[in-house]
A protein has these predicted regions:
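Glycine/threonine-rich phosphate-binding loop and adjacent beta-strand/alpha-helix elements that clamp
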Residues: 1-217
Length: 217
């Protein structure tokens, strides 16, 4: 069967004090809705300086499971982490992220990566996804859905669940030059100012397919 019938689709909400840059920032991943009505995080996406691909379902020496700590120190990557788990957590099935976003680009990309943070703070990628958001100019935050690759992974006791949000994953995915032109036709790139909202009205979150443990009783 797929997905598993006993799957409990569980939303984990992103939250911060307005600075989710880098693991040392205030980005949090929680089961409760964010409380701050004006909360958001922002970053600048420059297509000339894309986030380099580090692991994932691609070819080459950087494919597969890869340490993410260097990527997470970039100023154009937002990082949200849970508390250390008190018991193992299995995630098996499809994964989606619902983000409420604003941008000043006519077209841009949004990327989400699910990460397992070990007790020594080493971070490893689990799966990721990307969405090309065209006709993106809006005055109010717009909901988007980023579909990540399905996975089957157990986060062990003492580990933390983390997601990274950015606007590029190159060269695995082609850069969006933020111009609205296709990759074939584009000749000029534009810098995009990106904003992610996490409020009671705009509760950005990732939905994990949690598999409850089977009791031995």
């Amino acid at each position: 069967e797929w997905p598993l019938r006993r799957t409990q689709y569980t939303p984990y909400y992103i939250d911060s004090a307005g600075d989710a840059h880098r693991p040392a920032g205030s980005g949090r991943l929680t089961l409760g809705l964010p409380a701050d009505a004006g909360a958001s995080d922002a970053f600048v996406y420059n297509p000339k300086q894309p986030v380099p691909s580090a692991g994932g379902a691609m070819l080459g020496p950087r494919a597969g499971v890869y340490i993410q700590n260097e990527i997470e120190e970039r100023s154009d990557v937002l990082v949200y982490s849970s508390q250390a788990l008190e018991e193992p957590l299995e995630t098996t099935g499809p994964i989606t992220a619902v983000l409420y976003v604003k941008t000043d680009a006519v077209s841009t990309d949004w990327t989400v990566k699910l990460v397992d943070v070990h007790p020594d703070s080493t971070a490893y990628n689990i799966c990721d996804g990307i969405l090309r958001h065209s006709y993106a100019l809006e005055r109010t935050p717009q909901p988007i859905k980023v579909v990540l690759w399905p996975t089957s992974h157990v986060f062990l006791t003492g580990h933390r669940i983390r997601i990274e949000i950015s606007s590029s994953n190159f060269p695995r995915y082609d850069r969006n030059l933020n111009s609205g032109d296709t990759s074939v036709d584009a000749t000029v790139s534009h810098i995009a100012h990106q904003q992610i909202y996490h409020t009671p009205r705009y509760p950005s979150h990732i939905v994990l397919p949690v598999i409850p443990a089977i009791s031995n009783r």
